[in-house]
């Protein structure tokens, strides 16, 4: 039904020039707390597999989701935990800042995507807020660190 009303064009159909992507992976080691929490996830999974817990209380989807959050930052599961110096977020901030410094004369823009977390104003931990705070503390002007979530009109989104 969707195809009846949609005009779909794929990249190969319109031959758009696309820049060559340069991928790189940054590996970070987990904190001791993360290692302990991974062991706890394994224990939870064993209980679920063994049928020892009601699926409304815990299930593999919840465990997997908690594992994804934990892999990003331990504070995603418990915002009372410390900010681990060698976390993925801190590695990301280091990289963003390095690129910002290297391209400051060109006023280049960077886009950063995070599929976990959203900006929050309720005092709880947010990956977005943490990254913004750290970039501003390093000297990037606050006006240069924006979230798509803050663009509440089509005009703002185009800017």
Regions found by a protein language model. Name each.
Residues 96-107:
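Glycine-rich phosphate/diphosphate-binding loops that line cofactor/substrate pockets in enzymes
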Residues 81-93, 123-128:
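Phosphate/oxyanion-binding active-site loops and adjacent basic polyanion-contact surfaces
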Residues 62-66, 91, 130:
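Amphipathic alpha-helical interaction segments
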Residues 1-82, 98:
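Inter-lobe coupling linker of SF2 helicases/translocases
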Residues 116-147:
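Conserved helicase motor "Helicase C" RecA-like lobe of SF1/SF2 P-loop NTPases
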Residues 68, 74, 116-118, 152:
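Short, glycine/serine-rich, charged loops/turns that create anion-binding
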Residues 108-116:
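Conserved RecA-like ASCE P-loop NTPase motor core of nucleic-acid helicases/translocases
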Residues 141-159:
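Conserved helicase ATPase core of P-loop NTP-dependent helicases/translocases
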């Amino acid at each position: 039904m969707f195809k009846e009303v949609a005009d779909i064009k794929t990249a190969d159909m319109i031959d758009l020039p696309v820049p060559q992507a340069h991928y790189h992976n940054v590996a970070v080691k987990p904190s001791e707390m993360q290692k302990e929490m991974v062991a706890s996830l394994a224990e939870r999974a064993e209980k679920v597999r063994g049928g020892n817990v009601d699926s409304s209380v815990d299930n593999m989807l919840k465990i997997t989701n908690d594992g994804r959050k934990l892999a990003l930052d331990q504070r995603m599961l418990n915002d009372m935990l410390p900010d681990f110096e060698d976390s993925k977020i801190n590695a990301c901030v280091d990289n963003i800042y390095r690129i910002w410094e290297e391209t400051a004369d060109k006023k280049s823009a960077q886009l950063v995507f995070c599929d976990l977390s959203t900006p929050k104003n309720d005092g709880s931990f947010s990956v977005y807020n943490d990254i913004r705070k750290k970039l501003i503390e390093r000297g990037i002007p606050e006006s240069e660190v924006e979230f798509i979530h803050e663009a509440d009109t089509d005009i703002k989104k185009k800017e």
